[in-house]
Amino acid sequence: MADKTSFLDKCLSIHSLLLQHGIDSGIIFKQNESECFITVNGKSKRYTSDDDIDIDTEFSALEKF
């Protein structure tokens, strides 16, 4: 399993980038913070602490929601 702090930081970084670019989004953490859901325009993407998350790639994908 990936480092939990790193996972949380990555989820929060993606969410922060969306907000900085004026994209209304939400974030929810579940399962003892081993899952996060980022919502943009009513669509959610689920991430788990086992995922290899690239912040720039995920931001670009969510930006298109």
Where does each model-flagged region fall?
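Short acidic DE-rich linear segments
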Residues: 2-6, 60-65
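Negatively charged, low-complexity tracts enriched in Asp/Glu with abundant Ser/Thr
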Residues: 2-22
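Acidic, low-complexity, intrinsically disordered interaction modules
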Residues: 16-58
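Surface-exposed charge patches in extracellular/virion surface proteins
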Residues: 10, 45-46, 64
